[in-house]
Amino acid sequence: MEQMKKMPLEGIRVVELATVVAAPTASRVLCAFGAEVIKVETKIGDEMRRAGEFEMVVCEDDKNPLFTIQNSGKRLTSIDLKNPDGKAAFLKLLETADVFLTNVRLPSLGRLGLDYETLHKAYPGLVYAHFSGFGPKGPDAAKPGFDSTAFWLRSGPMADWQVPGSFPFTPTYAFGDMATSSAFLSGILMAIIGKKSTGMGTFVSTSLFASGIWCNAIGVVSHQPQFGGERPNDPLRPADPFCHFYECSDGKWIGVFDNEYRRELPKFANLFGMPEIADDPRAASLEALHETDFVVEIVTRLNAIFKTRPVAEWEAFLSENNVSCERVRTIRDVSTDEQAIANGYIQKVTFKDDLEVMMPCPPMQFTEYAMRPYTSAGRLGADTDSIFRDLGYTDPEIAAMKASGAIR
């Protein structure tokens, strides 16, 4: 019999005091690979429990796919940190933790006595992982930040990726949060590794704004005034006409991608039936294309050429000629994508009442480590009794704390 594979983060305990998407997603991935994550919610619960109302997805206890993305496998409790008994119970939890993960704003943490300085003094080995909208310093440190504001609006893409003059594009809910969670996860893992050699915890932080800048790093550099990059792009004047999007005869679009214009120019010129441009000095370089505005003529011709065939034919033709391309797909396509299913990037999860949903999975895999299977996240306070029994509380003490509102 094949030996059971272990998970790489077994033995790590994380106490999470966080809501919505980015921070809980980081701890969700820690949990998927073996960490024990105890999620502490308020009396009314993480607002992510109700996000389905906004996205038209069911959001009931034991049948809450959106909440499950971020919280599968976690142990769930609810503590009132303003209640003395609740605060004491929370500190007792922290005594057992390797990581404290939170996105509560720093001033609020200070008022609760949960600031880094206080906790580092009490628990010097604790990794204190803090997530925010705009970062822990500067004039906007205490400003509330969301995916749409701090990631998309503040770092530029909401304005600069749109078609000129159009309404700002609207990304799906929490796209930037999910991207940023990977940066947060990386920082936490580095802090855990560092603790193994030093024995000391640290304050590790990231923010939606930091991630927005990092994800958009090429644009942030190339659009500084000394370089002159400009966006939004004119659809007739892309940087490279062979790295652009074209509409096909069936009304669907395809993206063609070439990262070495000068080397690939003869190939593309012949593929698209315009061999003469390979020797045209106006097409000799990307600089020449734009200095002469010859790019407009090429794109206009390519627009007409692509409208002679449906997208499937273009996709087959370009792939046969080793051209990187992809039809523009919709989000609806992903849940049935054979490539995604074959690689385990999405998997079927059955919720209460036999509701089946194709759920996105953490985007990393190992040959020698296991990953915790997807399970439906439970109701508010689902694991309170077992969590506090593990801390040494008796059943009468747990009942008394529930009666006082300290826990739920």
Q: Where are these predicted regions, by residue range?
A:
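N-terminal helix-loop segment corresponding to the beta1-alpha1 unit
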Residues: 1-200, 379, 385-408
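Mid-domain beta-loop-alpha active-site segment that forms a flexible
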Residues: 174-189, 208-216, 260, 264
